[in-house]
């Protein structure tokens, strides 16, 4: 029978794709940050998405010489669409770059619509079997049918698949997707795959080891997945891959769900004057049973959805409760919000340094004039608490009592980027190497918000004062007070009131209230120009007849083939001119007038780590002011001396589908 029957379709809707992933960073070898090995690793991993998808789902290569040589491999599950494969490989590569900070080996098996694998090392592993590291994840649900019978069917299915995967005569070596029936309405779905650079013998060994892990990891569970560096094996009681829709399955040996109907021609039963055909009886009973079954299935679906919703809500409540601090504890930590504890002020309130449970923290006390309600405040806390990335400031907790709304963040000792960048006496502490590292770190942080986190998050207020610096001058993006969350099918939104900081906001946002991930890209471009020139984005270049803002000034220098005139004099003597020029080029691509012309953060990241990536010519930026007369300059001077204004209006947002 074909697997496109009614029950698997309902089961697929009920269960959906389970999100599984695993990763491992090596523990024996390490490289020096910003070394040639790190550069080679970034270049090679950035090349994998396009190469793997273009070569049928598998690609391996190496780059560099001697101890700086990096070997890498990427593989997608057989049959994956090229664009889906590319997205998964890109996600895996970025995952390794963000988590394996200085390890010379790394392995990631993420699932992003499909299952894929990326692996890198400082020694060649191509064509070699590596059984370790291995890890597994099992389904949380137990088997409810006969376990002995399940094991027998499962073992026969695994044996058959290994034979198919490693047979020299097989049409699809190194891969198998197959099914086996437990009952009329319960089917085991399984998939296994080796890296195709292995010998068939090594593939057989790898898969046998993975099958052998069943007793250890997943006995009695409805499903599981075993990852190894050279192969993967997964099974479930639901169709977790599109590959299963193309597989035919013979009817199970068990008794059918309904008894076989006897052959009835004109047989009838008489009672009084009523004559009832047995065929009519069956014609009534069978449809009734089917209808009842479907109704029960639909009710089960509704209960499942409500339970999932309840579980999600409960999880959020648990997270919120575990993060909540008592107001008295906050008062004590800040010496009753003493002026001497203030380390910053912003549009939403003041930031205090404090000590909670023996740990230094930054405590942000929102202004009582803030219109953000308690419910929205809690939602923001739950969302930010789930963000975990080395280039994002970590939220430790909150306090919500009466009119008090307080956020508790990790303490970042070196204050914010603007503290160093715009102070002539401190600019020298940021040499080009540090500035380039800050640009790279901000890129990774925004990429996580836009693409790699569970939700797509638009920051909407990227600026130098919202980039904090840790003890090693690594950047951490802060202040999510204006952030907006996009759903899976949302690519943009409109707002009737503007929130953000002048100079960093793109034209489509200021004029029409439209914002998207490309709004953050525009702000990022302005920020990069500030980092390079060491001056604020407000009007910085003045002559006897003209005043230009930063974007206009950078564009004019670019058009005049003199972009390096933009560079901060404190670093101009000791900077990599090619890197600086490339960063200016990328920044100008980010501030282009048309949002669709601006690159995505994943593309920007690739532009930064892969110098062979050809950059397109930038178009005229948004807010291009060619000449501002001398008569207007006095007013601009006063604006230049003032602090940048952040507009904190309440927003009314309409979302647009992709």
Swiss-Prot record:
<feature type="modified residue" description="Phosphotyrosine">
    <location>
        <position position="409"/>
    </location>
</feature>
<dbReference type="GO" id="GO:0004674">
    <property type="term" value="F:protein serine/threonine kinase activity"/>
</dbReference>
<keyword id="KW-0675">Receptor</keyword>
<keyword id="KW-0067">ATP-binding</keyword>
<feature type="domain" description="Gnk2-homologous 2">
    <location>
        <begin position="131"/>
        <end position="240"/>
    </location>
</feature>
<keyword id="KW-0732">Signal</keyword>
<keyword id="KW-0325">Glycoprotein</keyword>
<feature type="glycosylation site" description="N-linked (GlcNAc...) asparagine">
    <location>
        <position position="51"/>
    </location>
</feature>
<keyword id="KW-0597">Phosphoprotein</keyword>
<feature type="binding site">
    <location>
        <position position="364"/>
    </location>
    <ligand>
        <name>ATP</name>
    </ligand>
</feature>
<dbReference type="GO" id="GO:0016020">
    <property type="term" value="C:membrane"/>
</dbReference>
<feature type="modified residue" description="Phosphothreonine">
    <location>
        <position position="501"/>
    </location>
</feature>
<protein>
    <recommendedName>
        <fullName>Cysteine-rich receptor-like protein kinase 14</fullName>
        <ecNumber>2.7.11.-</ecNumber>
    </recommendedName>
</protein>
<feature type="glycosylation site" description="N-linked (GlcNAc...) asparagine">
    <location>
        <position position="146"/>
    </location>
</feature>
<keyword id="KW-0808">Transferase</keyword>
<feature type="modified residue" description="Phosphotyrosine">
    <location>
        <position position="509"/>
    </location>
</feature>
<feature type="glycosylation site" description="N-linked (GlcNAc...) asparagine">
    <location>
        <position position="102"/>
    </location>
</feature>
<feature type="signal peptide">
    <location>
        <begin position="1"/>
        <end position="22"/>
    </location>
</feature>
<comment type="similarity">
    <text>Belongs to the protein kinase superfamily. Ser/Thr protein kinase family. CRK subfamily.</text>
</comment>
<dbReference type="InterPro" id="IPR008271">
    <property type="entry name" value="Ser/Thr_kinase_AS"/>
</dbReference>
<dbReference type="Pfam" id="PF00069">
    <property type="entry name" value="Pkinase"/>
</dbReference>
<keyword id="KW-0472">Membrane</keyword>
<feature type="transmembrane region" description="Helical">
    <location>
        <begin position="278"/>
        <end position="298"/>
    </location>
</feature>
<keyword id="KW-0418">Kinase</keyword>
<dbReference type="InterPro" id="IPR002902">
    <property type="entry name" value="GNK2"/>
</dbReference>
<keyword id="KW-0547">Nucleotide-binding</keyword>
<feature type="glycosylation site" description="N-linked (GlcNAc...) asparagine">
    <location>
        <position position="60"/>
    </location>
</feature>
<feature type="topological domain" description="Extracellular">
    <location>
        <begin position="23"/>
        <end position="277"/>
    </location>
</feature>
<dbReference type="GO" id="GO:0005524">
    <property type="term" value="F:ATP binding"/>
</dbReference>
<keyword id="KW-0677">Repeat</keyword>
<feature type="binding site">
    <location>
        <begin position="343"/>
        <end position="351"/>
    </location>
    <ligand>
        <name>ATP</name>
    </ligand>
</feature>
<feature type="active site" description="Proton acceptor">
    <location>
        <position position="461"/>
    </location>
</feature>
<feature type="modified residue" description="Phosphoserine">
    <location>
        <position position="465"/>
    </location>
</feature>
<dbReference type="InterPro" id="IPR000719">
    <property type="entry name" value="Prot_kinase_dom"/>
</dbReference>
<dbReference type="InterPro" id="IPR017441">
    <property type="entry name" value="Protein_kinase_ATP_BS"/>
</dbReference>
<dbReference type="InterPro" id="IPR011009">
    <property type="entry name" value="Kinase-like_dom_sf"/>
</dbReference>
<keyword id="KW-1133">Transmembrane helix</keyword>
<keyword id="KW-0812">Transmembrane</keyword>
<feature type="topological domain" description="Cytoplasmic">
    <location>
        <begin position="299"/>
        <end position="658"/>
    </location>
</feature>
<feature type="domain" description="Protein kinase">
    <location>
        <begin position="337"/>
        <end position="614"/>
    </location>
</feature>
<feature type="domain" description="Gnk2-homologous 1">
    <location>
        <begin position="23"/>
        <end position="125"/>
    </location>
</feature>
<dbReference type="Pfam" id="PF01657">
    <property type="entry name" value="Stress-antifung"/>
</dbReference>
């Amino acid at each position: 029978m074909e697997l496109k029957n009614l029950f698997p379709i309902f089961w697929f809707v009920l269960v959906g794709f389970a999100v599984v992933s695993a990763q491992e960073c090596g523990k024996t070898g390490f490289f020096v940050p910003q070394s040639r090995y790190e550069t080679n690793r970034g270049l090679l991993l950035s090349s994998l998405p396009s190469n793997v998808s273009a070569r049928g789902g598998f690609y391996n290569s190496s780059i560099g010489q001697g101890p700086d040589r990096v070997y890498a491999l990427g593989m997608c599950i057989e049959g994956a669409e090229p664009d889906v494969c590319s997205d998964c490989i890109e996600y895996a590569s970025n995952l390794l770059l963000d988590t394996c900070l200085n390890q010379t080996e790394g392995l990631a098996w993420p699932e992003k619509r499909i299952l894929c694998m990326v692996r890198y090392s400082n020694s060649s592993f191509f064509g070699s079997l590596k059984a370790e590291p291995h890890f597994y994840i099992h389904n949380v649900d137990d088997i409810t049918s006969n376990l002995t019978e399940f094991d027998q069917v499962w073992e026969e299915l695994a044996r058959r698949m290994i034979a198919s995967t490693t047979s020299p005569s097989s049409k699809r070596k190194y891969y198998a997707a197959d099914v086996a029936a437990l009952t009329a309405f319960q089917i085991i779905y399984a998939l296994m795959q080796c890296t195709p650079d292995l010998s068939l013998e090594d593939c057989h060994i790898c898969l046998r080891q993975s099958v052998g892990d069943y007793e250890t990891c997943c006995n009695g569970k409805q499903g599981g997945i075993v990852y190894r560096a050279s192969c993967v094996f997964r099974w479930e009681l639901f169709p977790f891959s599109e590959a299963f829709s193309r597989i035919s399955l013979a009817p199970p040996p068990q008794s059918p769900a309904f008894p076989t109907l006897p052959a009835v021609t004109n047989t009838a039963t008489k009672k009084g004057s009523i004559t009832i055909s047995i065929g009519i009886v069956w014609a009534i009973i069978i449809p009734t049973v089917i209808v009842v079954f479907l109704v029960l299935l639909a009710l089960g679906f509704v209960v499942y959805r409500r339970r999932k919703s309840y579980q999600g809500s409960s999880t959020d409540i648990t997270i919120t409760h575990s993060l909540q601090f008592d107001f008295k504890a906050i008062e004590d930590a800040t010496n009753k919000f003493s002026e001497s504890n203030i380390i910053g002020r912003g549009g939403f309130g003041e930031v205090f340094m404090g000590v909670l449970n023996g740990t230094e923290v930054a405590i942000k006390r929102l202004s009582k004039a803030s219109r953000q309600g308690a419910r929205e405040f809690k939602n923001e806390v739950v969302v930010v608490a789930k963000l975990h990335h080395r280039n994002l400031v970590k939220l430790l907790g909150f306090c919500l009592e009466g009119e008090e709304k307080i956020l508790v963040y990790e303490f970042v000792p070196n204050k914010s980027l603007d503290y160093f960048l715009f102070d002539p006496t401190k600019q020298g502490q940021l040499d080009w190497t540090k500035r380039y590292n800050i640009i790279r770190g901000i890129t990774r942080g925004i990429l996580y918000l836009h693409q790699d986190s569970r939700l797509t998050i638009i920051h909407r207020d990227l600026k130098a004062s919202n980039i904090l610096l840790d003890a090693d001058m690594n950047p951490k993006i802060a202040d999510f007070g204006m952030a907006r969350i996009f759903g899976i099918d949302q690519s943009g939104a409109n707002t009737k009131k503007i929130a953000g900081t002048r100079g960093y906001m793109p034209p489509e946002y200021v004029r029409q209230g439209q914002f998207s991930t490309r709004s953050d890209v525009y702000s990022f471009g302005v920020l990069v120009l500030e980092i390079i020139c060491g001056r604020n984005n407000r009007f910085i270049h003045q002559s006897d007849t003209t005043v230009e803002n930063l974007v206009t000034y950078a564009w004019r220098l670019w058009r005049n083939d003199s972009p390096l005139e933009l560079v901060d004099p404190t670093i101009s003597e000791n900077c990599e001119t090619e890197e600086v020029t490339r960063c200016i080029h990328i920044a100008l691509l980010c501030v282009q007038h048309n949002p669709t012309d601006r690159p995505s953060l994943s593309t920007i990241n690739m532009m930064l780590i892969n110098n062979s990536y050809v950059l397109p010519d930038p178009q005229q930026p948004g807010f291009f002011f060619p000449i501002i007369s001398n008569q207007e300059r006095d007013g601009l001077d006063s604006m230049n001396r003032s602090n940048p204004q952040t507009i904190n209006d309440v927003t009314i947002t309409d979302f647009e589908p992709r």
